[in-house]
Regions:
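Acidic/His- and Gly-rich active-site-bordering loop/insert found
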Residues: 2-115, 138-143
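Acidic-enriched catalytic cores of C-N bond-cleaving enzymes acting on peptides and small amides
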Residues: 210-276, 285, 300-321
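An extended, acidic, His-containing surface patch that forms the Zn2+-binding/catalytic region
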Residues: 53, 70-77, 235-276, 322-416
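Short, solvent-exposed beta-strand/turn "edge" segments of beta-rich domains on protein surfaces
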Residues: 192, 265, 282-287, 334
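Fold-level recognition of mixed alpha/beta catalytic cores in primary-metabolism enzymes, strongest
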Residues: 114, 119-234, 241, 266-270, ...
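Generic non-transmembrane alpha-helical segments
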Residues: 10, 21-24, 28, 43, ...
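Histidine-centered divalent metal-coordination motifs
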Residues: 85-87, 209, 388
Length: 416
């Protein structure tokens, strides 16, 4: 019997425990903010200890522990890193009014789906990494090289205490390739992602009585006009690298299938979202202050200097406005035809009868941090059903499929 058949048989025999672990993981609430993931990290530790797996806590911030562990094969070879995060989006105290059909930290199973905050983003994917680490330890005499598990905190806020800290301070986590289980849909594999630029704009005017509009400009109207000008960024030309353009054209249907109709259209474009806006004190006053936050997504191939120059030219037209840069994560990508991409495609074909398509992610993941170090990083995860909203859930079949795909692909990578 081949090792890959043995891996699948082991997963089939242990699937009840694999599902139960994800339920327990979801029940260990780890919203960020505030970001305390200690209870959830203990759930992971308990499972790893039960299977006698090597691991350690790396906690540069006491309430945001990271879990790192490595196993070696029978001889030197390639080094694969598994990466997932422990923290999840927060939930409102009034969750029942938001339409949740079950408490968000319940991990309850309804119609063969596991419900709860973090079920798709990304406790399903992180669980797949953990089980892959456990499973491959049983076959370490049959593979070469090294397998490293990284379960991190502080991802949801792009914070400094998770993957960013590990990559800067723990050489063990770098490796030759990274595999991540962030939600991507079974139909797509992410080899890159758009970057992000977060800006805060503040507008100040003299203000006045609401009937005396001749005495002062309205800060809210100035902000509105500025936002309209910023929309022009979406029309900027982007020179997508040729090999990526080919991959994007081939994957358009699968991209829309996994991420919603229109996803393929905006992937190669700059997009603007005004996430928050605040201004004015009273209906019959001309506002003297208004502020808003802009979320600009940057496609692979965009010229950052061109983006910043365009923003500067726009802002110059509005002397009442000032701007502050809050965050910049450049876009990232690796080879859309790389070794791990081919391995993932082949295993999904064998398991599900179709080949997922390579795509660039619309949102941000920690996989970018490995790409910034010129280490290929690929993302294959569940469909993002309810991600960040009510009734987040993952079908049990999709979860088990992910465990199988990651375990088989890790084995293939380390035996190639």
């Amino acid at each position: 019997m081949s090792a890959k058949i043995e891996i699948l048989n082991w997963i089939e025999n242990e699937k009840h425990k694999i599902v139960l672990f994800l339920q327990e993981f979801i029940q260990a609430a780890s919203p960020n903010p505030p970001g305390d993931t200690t209870i959830a990290a203990k759930v992971i530790s308990k499972l790893l200890e039960k299977h006698k797996m090597p691991f350690r806590w790396v906690s540069p911030q006491k309430t945001m522990p990271n879990i790192v562990g490595s196993i070696n094969g029978s001889k030197p070879g390639r080094h694969l890193v598994l990466n997932g995060h422990i923290d999840v989006f927060p939930v409102s105290d009034n969750y029942s009014e938001e339409g949740w059909i079950t408490p968000p930290w319940s991990g309850e199973i309804i119609e063969d789906k596991i419900y709860g905050r973090g079920s798709t983003d990304m406790k399903c994917g992180t669980s797949a990494s953990i089980w892959t680490y456990i499973i491959l330890n049983k076959f370490k005499t049959k593979f070469s090289g090294k397998l490293t598990l990284t379960c991190v905190s502080d991802e949801e806020t792009f914070g400094p205490w998770g993957s960013r800290w590990l990559i800067d301070n723990e050489p063990e986590v770098l490796g030759d390739c990274c595999l991540n289980g962030e939600p991507s849909s079974p139909f797509t594999i992410r080899y890159g992602e758009k970057g992000l630029l977060w800006l805060t704009f503040k507008v100040q005017t003299d203000g006045s009585h609401g009937a005396y509009t001749h005495l002062s400009k309205s800060a809210t109207l100035v902000a509105t006009n500025l936002i309209q000008e910023l929309k022009s960024l979406e029309a900027l030309d982007v020179e997508v690298p040729h090999e990526l353009l080919k991959a994007q054209e081939k994957s358009a249907t699968a991209f829309d299938q996994g991420m919603g109709v229109g996803a393929a259209n905006i992937a190669p474009k700059v997009t603007l979202n005004i996430g928050t806006i605040s201004g004015g004190l009273k209906n019959n006053m001309v506002p003297s202050e208004c502020s808003f936050e802009a979320d600009i997504r940057l496609p692979v191939g965009c010229n950052l200097d061109k983006i910043f120059n365009s923003i500067a030219e726009i802002t110059k037209k509005f002397p009442e406005a000032s701007m502050e840069q809050n965050m910049l994560n450049p876009p990232s990508h690796c080879n859309p035809d790389g070794d791990m991409m081919q391995i993932l495609k082949s295993n999904v074909q064998d398991l599900r009868g179709f080949q997922p398509e390579p795509v660039v992610s619309l949102g941000g993941t920690d996989a970018r941090l490995w790409r910034y170090k010129n280490i290929p990083a690929y993302v294959y995860g569940p469909t993002p059903t309810g991600m960040g909203s009510a009734n987040e859930n993952v079908p049990i079949d999709d979860y088990l499929h992910l465990v199988k795909t990651h375990a088989l692909s890790a084995y293939d990578y380390l035996t190639n």
